[in-house]
């Protein structure tokens, strides 16, 4: 950890944490707030959104950036009984499709789409009067409204083209080994600047550190992918006053 080692004074090490399971999925769940044998519980990002509220009405307050092909990863951003409006929103760093299923259809004018959403909003109000106790309906309405607003705000938030070359190098984006995670952490910093309270940025799909043999070689490879991006993220956050 040659790069991260320079930042240890800005990191808190919690040495009292432990796990009662040797199963990876169970340890993931405990890391995010519950034991696998407990009833389903909201994860920590959902609790933060629920307890602290919203800083930016145009962006989700709990964001997931990474790969989630494994269903166990998806458990890390579920809000459970708090309601789906507090679940994490999965974003892609693909500028053409940053929000899955949230891109405006080609050929549809912005004014036309706005009129469509206003019409749907009126119908939703009628449904809300008819079913006042339907929490799922209210959450769905809010999610659609947020999705509409995010069509403009999310592409801007993940667009790193305006960042300086120095910043890109700080995160290791100029190197193939560190580029993927560097971009994800840079996007996480931009989310934080815009009022997103909690961002999960994963380096890979499930099992990155699950080395059962050749530990030195495989762990060294994994460390190399994240060392400089994490250090760059911490340094960038600190100089911008975002660690205060």
State what each model feature region is.
Residues 1-244:
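Ligand-binding pockets and gating/stacking loops
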